[in-house]
Amino acid sequence: MSKSFAYRHIWCFWRFNTPLLWFPQPLKYWPAFQQSHTFNSMSVFKNDNAIANQTTVNESDVKRNVEKINDIYECSNNTKSPCFPNSDSRIPLVNWKTSTNPTLQVRAYMLDLLLPFFTLDLLPFLNKVCECCNHMLLDNPKIKQDLPFAFCYLFSSYFSYKSSRQYTCSSEEISKVFRHLNRLGGSEYVLHLFAQIPKALCKELTDVRTLNHPLRSIFTFCFKNISNPPNLLKLLTKLYPRSDRANEVLYTQYLGFLTKRGDYQIAIYMFDEMYRTHHWSSFTACRLMIESLVRQNKFEEAISLYKKIIAKRPKIARDKKILNLLLYISTVSNRSPDAFKLALQSISNANQIPSFDVFSRLMSALVKYNMTEMILPLVKQYDHKFRNLYSPNIFLSIVQALVFCGDMVNIQRWYNMSRVNSELSRIKHLLNCFLNSSTVSLDVSMVLELLRDLKKKKIKVDERTLVICITIFSRRKDLFAMEKIHQYFSDQGIKTSNQAYAALLDAYIEAEDTEKIELYLGKIRRLGITEDVSINRMLMRLALDRLDWDLLEQCTKVAERKDPEGQDYLSTITMLYHVRQHELNLALRIFSGIQKPNVVHYSIAATVLGNLNQLDQLLLLEKRMESEGKAPTALSLVAFVSSYCKQGAEGLDEAKRYMSKNFQPDKRALLFNPRTANDMTYPPSLFSSLIKEYTSLGDIKEAKQVLSTYLEYFSKNITSKPDIPFAIASMRLYCSLHDTVLSRQFWDLILQVAQQNFITTDIAAVVDDKNIPSPSGVIPAYKSALNVAAETYFSFLASVNSFQELDQEWSRLEKLGFEYDDSLQNKRIIWLLYDDRLDAAIKRVYNIFLSSKRIEELIPDASSQNSIISFFLSPDSPLYFSTLKALRDKLDMAVEDDFVRISQGILVPTVKYLQTIRRDNEILFNLLAKV
C-alpha cells in the first residue's frame, strides 16, 4: 500500500463516516516556546522568551507573538493536502513535514503516524503514543527537546476530536497523560494542554470548589519546574480566553502551592489578579488567602479581606471552612470580636450550624467572649439540625465549654449523656480540660467520676494522663490521693515519666514534705534525669523554696545549655529568690536585664516597687508595659492594684483608676477565664485589697462601690468563684458596719468554699478494690487555712456579744477538721472571759497549752516545774502573757465576789475553786501566782 493511498484512505474514513476533524488552530493561541528550545535555523524565535520573562502581559504583545509564529507556518490556500479538504485553510501536514524546523518535523511525523489511532480510547492511545516516542528517541536522541511540544499538540487534537463525539474519560486517565508529559520535560506544556481540554471531556477537572484537585500533585511538580509561573498563568488567560474555568483552576492551584510554601507576597499578588482582573472569587481561593493571613498572625487583614469578599459574593459567608477560620481567629488571637461577630452573624443568617467543626470552635469562642448564656441554646439548635448525631468530639466540646464556665450542674448532666452516647476512650481527654479549670479540679468530683469510668470500662491511659492526675491532686495539696493515684497507674504498667517525677516533686515542695522531697531527689539522681528540662525547672523551684543559691546556679547552667525556651522561667525564679531574700533592688536589676519581660516579670516588679513605696516608678512601669503591647492578665491586675493600695491615699486613687481602665465589661472575659488564669481566685482577689483599704480608711461608700462592682460581675459570670480572701475582705466590711446578716452570709460563703476545696478526696473508693477508706477530713495543708477568716468573724461576734453563736461556729470548724493556731486559741480564752466563763477559760488553758503532751512537745528536756513555768513566762511561750494577766485579773475579781460560776451555772466558793486548781493543775496555779 502506497503512502498516498493511506492518506486518501484516512481522509475518506473521516470525511464520510464522521464529521470533519477540525484540529484546533495550532499556532493562533500557542504561546512562546520554552527557553530550553533553540532553533538554529529559525532566528525569528530568538526574542520569544522575552514575553515569558515580562512582569506584565498586554494584548499587543500576544498579537505580535502570534503573528511571528503564524508567519513561520505561512502556506498557500491553493496547497492541496491529502489530509485536509480543499476548503480547509489550516496548515497542511505536508508543509509541517517539509519544514526545516525540527519541532514541526517531529510533530508532523507523530501526527502522520498516530492519526489512524484517534478512534482508540485514551489509555490505549496513550500507549501507542508512548511507543512512538520511545522509537523516535531510539532513532534520534536529539529530538528529546522537541517531543513535549509535539506530544502536547497531539493530545490537544485528540481531546478535541474525542469531545466532539461525546467521549468522556476519568481524571485518573487524563492524569497519566500529564505525568508522561512531565517526564518528557514539558511542565509548561502541561498547563497549556490543561487549558485546552474541553470541559465536556471531564467535568471534574474544572471544579474550582476543592483544593484537592485530581491533578494537584502534577500541578505542584509543574510549578516547581517553571521559571516564572505567574507570568505563564497570565499568558494563558490571554491565549485561551474561552477556558475561563480551567484558568481559574490553575490560579487556585497555584495559590495553594504558594501558601503551602509560605510565599505569601506572591500569593496576595495572584489573588488580587484573580479578584480584580478576572473577577474570580471561589470559596477555595478565598479560604486559601484567609488561611495565609492567619498563618502570618495578620488577623485584622484576614477579617478585612473577608468583609470585601462577602460584599461581592455573600454566599461565601456560608462556607463552613471559611466560617471555621473566622472562629479560629476569634479564639486564638488576643481579641478579635469582629471575627466572632461576623461568624455569629453568618450562623444566624443561615439559621443553622453548618458542621461539627464549626460547632466545636463556636463553643470555645463563646467561652472566650463570656457569652455562656448562648451555649445551651446553641446546643439545642445543633440537636435540632443533626438529630442527636452527637460525636465524641461534640460531647467533648460541649463539656469543655461548660467546664470553662464552671457550671457544675450542666457539666454533670452532659458528662452523663456522653457516657451513654459516645466513646469513653475520647472522654479521657477531659482530664486535661479539668486541669485547666480550678473550679472543676478543686471540686474534684468530676475527676473522680471520670477515673471511675476509666477503670470500669478498662480504658487504656497513658503517661500524660498520669501527669494530669498527679497535677490535679497536688494542686489540691491532697498528697494521699496523689500517691494513691500514682500507685494505681503504676500497677497498670504506666511508666512514671520525667514530667510525672517533676509533678510529684512540685507537689512535695508545695507541701514542704522534706522527707518525700529527699526520697524523690534520690530517685531522680539514680535515674540520671536531673538535667531533664521539666526536672530542672522543679529543682529551680526547690532552690527558691530553700533559698539555696548554689543549687540555683547549677540549675541555671543546665537551663542555659538545654532549656533555651525556659529563660523566662529562670528569670522569674531568680527575681523571686532575691525578693524572698529581701534583696529588692537586685530583683529590679534582674528585671531591667530581661530583653523582653513577660507579664509575670512585670507583676513581680510591680509587687517589689509597691513594697519599696515607689509610686512614681510604679506608674512608669505601667506605662512601659502598655507601650510594649503587653495585655494585662489577672495576675498583673492583682499585682498592680495591690501595690497601688500600699501607697496611701494617692496610691488608692491610682488603684481605682487602674481598676476602672482595665476592668471594662468587654475585657473581663479575656482577663478572667480558665484559659488565661488557671487559678480562679484572681478575679475576687483583685477586689480584696481595694475593699480592705477603703474599709481601713473608713471610706465605706467606696468599699461598697467596689463590692457592688464585683457582685455585678459575679452575677453575670459563672466562671468566677468567690475565694476566701475576697470573702474575708467583704466580711470585714460588713463587720465594721455591724451588719450581722451580711457578715454571716460571707462567713457561710467561706465555709462553703472550704468544704469544696479543702476536704480530702475519697480516692480509695475509686481505684482501690480492697475498699480501704481514705482518711477523711481536711487536707493537712489546709488545716489552718481558715484562721484569719475565723479571727475576723469571731472577733465581730464577741464585739456584739453573740457568744452563743461564737461557740457554735467554733465547734462547727472543729468538727470539719480545721485547726486553730495559738494566737486564735489565746483570743478564744479572752472571749470566754468576756462572757464571764472563767472556769471554761481555765480548762481551755490547761487542755490546749498545759497538757503533758503539749509540754513535752514544747519543752522536751524539761527537768523541773520551775523550768516549765519559766518557759511559759518567756517571749517564746505560745500562751501569751496578756492572756495570763487577763486570767489573773478575772480570778482577783472572783476573790472579791467570793464565788466562781462553773458549768451549768453552779456557783462555787472562790477559795474552794482555787484549791481545786492547785490540786488538779499545780503548774497553772503557780504560773498565775507569778503573774
UniProtKB/Swiss-Prot annotation:
| Primary subcellular site in the record, as a coarse category | mitochondrion
Recorded hits in InterPro entries, A to Z, give: Pentatricopeptide_rpt, TPR-like_helical_dom_sf
A GO cellular component term found in this entry reads: cytoplasm
- Look up the domain of life of the source: Eukaryota
* Extent of the PPR repeats: 247-277, 282-316, 429-461, 462-496, 497-531, 598-632, 683-713
Give GO MF terms, alphabetically. Answer: mRNA 5'-UTR binding; mRNA binding; translation activator activity; translation regulator activity
Locations listed in the record: Mitochondrion
Q: In its keyword annotation, does this UniProt entry include Heme?
A: no
Instruction: Summarize what gene deletion causes.
Output: Impairs growth on galactose. Decreases the association of cox1, but not cob1, mRNA with the mitochondrial small ribosomal subunit.
UniProt GO BP: mitochondrial gene expression; mitochondrial translation; mitochondrial translational initiation; positive regulation of mitochondrial translational initiation
Keyword Transcription set for record: no
Q: Which UniProt keywords apply?
A: Activator, Mitochondrion, Protein biosynthesis, Repeat, RNA-binding, Transit peptide, Translation regulation
Q: Where are the transmembrane segments?
A: none
Question: Which positions form the organelle transit peptide?
Answer: 1-16
Role according to the record: RNA-binding translation activation factor that as part of the MRH5C complex specifically recruits cox1 mRNA to the mitochondrial ribosome for translation initiation.
Oligomer status and interactors: Component of the MRH5C complex, composed of mrh5, ppr4, mtf2, and sls1. Proteins mtf2 and sls1 form a subcomplex that serves as a scaffold to bring mrh5 and ppr4 together. The MRH5C complex associates with the small subunit of the mitochondrial ribosome.
Name by which UniProt lists this protein: Mitochondrial cox1 translation regulator ppr4
Organism for this UniProt entry: Schizosaccharomyces pombe (strain 972 / ATCC 24843) (Fission yeast)
Question: Gene encoding this polypeptide?
Answer: ppr4
